[in-house]
Amino acid sequence: MKNCKKKILCGFLAGAVLFASGCGNKDTQDQAKVQRYAWPLGSSSPEDTVTQIYAEKFAEEVERLSDGTMLISVYPNSVLGGDRELLESCKEGDIPFVVQNTAPQVTFMPDVAVFDMPAVFETIDEVREHVDNPDFLSMMQQVYGDAGYVLLGYADQGFRVMTTNRNVQSISDFKGQKIRTMENSYHMAYWKALGASPTPMTFSEVYIGLQQGTIDAQENPYEVIVSNKLYEQQDYVVETNHLPHLISLIVSDEFFEGLTGEQQEIIREAAETAKEYAREQSDERIASLSLIHISEP
């Protein structure tokens, strides 16, 4: 499978080089009018997600703002690799663009763990205000820059919430519940502090785990709960809102620096528009949910 992905990627890169190798001269400008291959953007998320909406809107805006001379193709569902592979390929310049949750990035950029501190924010508007703050954004851009990426912005899928078959009304109701978490020490420490029993598990095993009773509960943003039909195995959503589920849009620093100033500006403007659009879509999706009981402990 990895060899297959490498072959696919090599084909993308060959085309990308044809377009990007001569940026800045007249021949390249003429060539750009008939860009033969689109730059790949990789994601590990399924199609029907805000992550995909974010990626597709970005690609659409890049094409619109460049009058069709800059093209990006979005590849979801880990077609170009899982989260770790995408980050590695992006850093090496093999996959120019990646859209993904910030949690997998902590291994590469430990300071990104700032988003793993639980119960810091009360509303998603407060989260957005902070991540858009010029000073904070500048610091995070430096973190990504030091690692070989250019951070173009953060959208989100709202907060992460808990699903369970227990009607949680107080802190004591968390006690003993086996809850699936990502393999993240900060996440696990939070649930331990509440008295629950955090159980790291790959996401592909969550539905079966709930069905077979291997785990009692899990935590994810609403959209993931709905798109993966976890409500079929769970009766309650507990609005813990313990962490914002942030989605980053990044580009390889090496690739970005090889573009003209005009192209870079188009990419930044497209990213800003896509970010705002993705946030609107996230809010609308969350507001439309009515599949399971919601409790607020």
Task: Please place each PLM-identified region on the residue numbering.
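N-terminal secretory/targeting leader peptides
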Residues: 24-126, 135, 142-295
